Amino acid sequence: MRSLQNSIVLLAVLVLAVLPVAAAAQPGYVALGDSVDFGIGSSTGAGWVVPFNGFLSSPSVFNAPVELLNLAVPGAETKDVDQDQLAAAVAAASAHSPVVVSLGGGGNDLRHFIVSPAAHACLKVQSCLARLNALLNEAEQRVDLALKKLREAAPNATILVRTQYNPLRGTGCAAPDLVALGDASLEAPPSSAIKGGGLNWRLRAAAARQGAKVIELFLPFAFFGDSALVGDCIHPNDFGYSLIVLQAVTAFTAP
């Protein structure tokens, strides 16, 4: 009887030895967005996404190499993120565990509106405010859809939503009325003439609906001003990108 038991155990060991072993899913980080997430303005091209990925790979977080997929495209609007980046992001997010996803967007949607000739008097013209509200509504809906699909693909993912700063605050970048419009378009509360609030309010609301965390950028960039921007009135410099990394780490580690 003992001989039979030993034979069965040996057979089981041999069977297990030849069975394919499922590879453990590798930690992953998927970034969607525009030129800020791509890293334009960084002297090394690393921007904020690459050093943040280094943080995720560190012993204090995943303690393992984290596979990075940066899908961000310079100039992308929210519609471009949904059309050109989302499908690949969903596939990558579902293939990694644990996984972190960051989503940036909306800045180009607003920038193209704010630099238009009609924008100078926008805060005083109801028809212009109506167009701005419509633009913000569309951006919010697209971000909401993207976050919903990402959450469905990776229910346990840590999702980060990057809010926008106002680059027009840089010296010589815009007339005061356009700087004010930029601020309002981003941070006007829902009770203001911009119904539903500025873009960042909407991004925070969309994040809350999908259990995502928020990378807050408006106040840090407003505080440091020119020190955080390159000379193109759009992108961060190396110091600006370090601010984004800091805010991303803060958001990631928040309860």
Set out the residue ranges of the language-model regions.
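Bacterial N-terminal signal peptides
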Residues: 9-19
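Bacterial N-terminal signal peptides that target proteins for export
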Residues: 1-10
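Short amphipathic alpha-helices and their capping/turn segments at secondary-structure boundaries
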Residues: 21-26, 81-101, 145-156
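Catalytic His-Asp segment of secreted/periplasmic serine-dependent ester chemistry enzymes
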Residues: 164-255
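Solvent-exposed loop/turn segments at secondary-structure junctions
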Residues: 35-38, 73-79, 106-112, 165-170, ...
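Serine-esterase "nucleophile elbow" of acetyl-processing enzymes
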Residues: 24-74, 101
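Oxyanion-hole/transition-state-stabilizing segment in secreted/luminal serine hydrolases
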Residues: 80-136, 166-167
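Surface-exposed cleft-lining segments at the edges of enzyme active sites
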Residues: 74, 123-140, 186-192
